[in-house]
Amino acid sequence: MKRDRERIRDLLVRLENDQNGVIIIGGVLNASVEEITDEYHLKLMADEGLVVETHHSGWRLTSIGHDAVEALSKLAFWEQLKSAGPKEAYELLKGATSSLAVAAISKLMGWG
């Protein structure tokens, strides 16, 4: 499965906007392709410390994840990042969020 930057951003925003701060994805025997893809991307995000699994199939943002979503949720900034080369995207991020979030996002998105 390929990494999907849009899906990662959408999941971060979805987590931040959730009333309970937790989304339930995965862990179902008959999961849809969408659920399997979301769970895969959440695990990639967990690898970089942006989210943690709270209980069976529940996911929440970490402090670094909140920093990341603050930067990536601004649509104009996101569009700028997507059109930038890896080095330029990394430099743009450095001015927009914490150093831990920059490192996590850059590695996850392939920009650093």
Question: Where do the language-model regions lie?
Answer:
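Short amphipathic alpha-helical interface segments
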Residues: 2-31
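Leucine-rich, amphipathic alpha-helical/linker segments
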Residues: 81-112
